UniProtKB/Swiss-Prot annotation:
Subcellular localization, as worded in the UniProt entry: Nucleus
Organism domain of life: Eukaryota
Family statement: Belongs to the cyclophilin-type PPIase family. PPIase H subfamily.
Gene: cyp3
Name of this chain's protein: Peptidyl-prolyl cis-trans isomerase H
Functional note: PPIases accelerate the folding of proteins. It catalyzes the cis-trans isomerization of proline imidic peptide bonds in oligopeptides.
Reaction catalyzed: [protein]-peptidylproline (omega=180) = [protein]-peptidylproline (omega=0)
PROSITE patterns according to UniProt: CSA_PPIASE_1, CSA_PPIASE_2
Lineage, broadest ranks: Eukaryota, Fungi, Dikarya, Ascomycota, Pezizomycotina
GO BP: protein folding
GO CC annotation, single: nucleus
Entry EC number(s): 5.2.1.8
SUPFAM superfamilies in the record: Cyclophilin-like (SSF50891)
Length: 181
């Protein structure tokens, strides 16, 4: 069965962006379509962390701006979104809980550029996400796909090919700006 979102972006789903810097040097922009039509809760969680609409307990904006891609594995994926601890251990949601349930597994990890939730097991979605750099069908049914890269796959490839030590980038890969288009 063909993925219902294997083509260009729709007119109704939100488009968000990350501006990326590597070691303080701007690399460019990644634009992503969020599949709000298939995974509305997951897409909205990510969208609000992109726009800064989400507030922490002190009423301050929280989200992906100035956070890192903390895990990079060539020929697999790039992972980020831990603005809580910055190292892959933090979790936060817009729903007032540290984690939320898997919404569905309708969409598949069938190509590079798939945007999916990182987790630590069933129903442990938070703020962390990853972008695939190849098809990863072994993740189907385990991680919720909620978007796709629509522009800037060259930037994803630059991140994928950055030098790492034990899957951690040697230089900081920072989301310097983010928001909704």
């Amino acid at each position: 069965m063909e993925d219902i979102h294997s083509g260009p972006a729709t007119n109704t789903n939100p488009i968000v962006f990350f501006d990326i810097a590597l070691g303080g040097v701007p690399l460019g922009r990644i634009k992503m379509e969020l599949f709000a039509d298939v995974t509305p809760r997951t897409a909205e969680n990510f969208r609000r962390f992109c726009t800064g609409e989400s507030k922490n307990s002190q009423g301050k904006p929280q989200g992906y701006k100035n956070s890192k891609f903390h895990r990079v594995i060539k020929d697999f994926m790039i992972q980020g979104g831990d603005f809580v601890n910055g190292d892959g251990t933090g979790s936060c949601t817009i729903y007032g809980t540290p984690k939320f349930a898997d919404e569905n597994f309708v969409l598949k990890h069938d190509r590079a550029g798939v945007l999916s939730m990182a987790n630590s097991g069933p129903n442990t979605n938070g703020c962390q996400f990853f972008i695939t750099t190849t098809a990863t069908p072994f993740l189907n049914g385990k991680h919720v796909v909620f978007g796709q890269v629509v522009d800037g796959m060259d930037i994803v490839r630059m991140i994928e090919n950055t030098r790492t030590i034990r899957d951690k980038p040697s230089q900081d890969v920072i989301i310097t700006q983010c928001g909704e288009m």
